[in-house]
Amino acid sequence: MSNVFAGKKIAKDTIEEDYVGSGGIFDTDIYQAKIKTAYIGKAQSSEARNVTLLLDINGRELRSQTWVSNKNGDVTYRDKQTGEIKNLPGYNTMNSVALLVAGKNLGDLDTEELVVKLYDFEAKKELPQAVTCFTQLHGEMINVAVQRQTVDKTKKNDSTGDYEPTGETRDQNEIVKFFAGEKLVTISEVAEFIKSLGEKFDDVVDSGHLLKAIRKVPEEAGIFASKWLERNKGQIYDKSTGKKAAEGITSALS
């Protein structure tokens, strides 16, 4: 089966930059995970695509969905300030996974249609569904920086079709950074190491030697992970708006 990202026009800079910033809720930390399934999803109303990872962390499942293309199916956008063509952040994120795990860009991975059990929100249970999978990632290890967040509970407004805050909150997890499976280095740190050797990152990828280069990166090069842990480990990030509750207070006082 063809890879929908194969041949996509991407920006020259394909390296995700470093910014410190379902199986139950994980505390904020870095975890080693096995990739159970990696598959492509599509929006119902457009050509937008996402990639979902089902991860096994010590027998517990963590699901991560990342949108990698816009409604037209493009993976790039034009920066309004500079006019520069850049990759969408979601594409760079999933491209970093492909590079760290398989040593290839996302568009160069082999894909295969498989039937896997996925949660169906209408049926409210897991059902067998056919999805396009990145099978080269299946069974491989990766390290993930997981953030615990408090967010709004939402409910669909039948008149507008939009999902709006109910005034209640729930906790969820979000993966904010991926690292190599065997050591805590990001793809950006790998690229810097390759540059320090006088080589070009793209040349190393194209020659099929990226995984070998990752193995050679010294442990002390993994600066981002230690800084992220120092700043974030154990924290809960409140991203809720309190919108519904605020509206209720306003109504009561009016």
Residue ranges and their predicted role:
Residues 1-254:
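Short beta-rich binding modules
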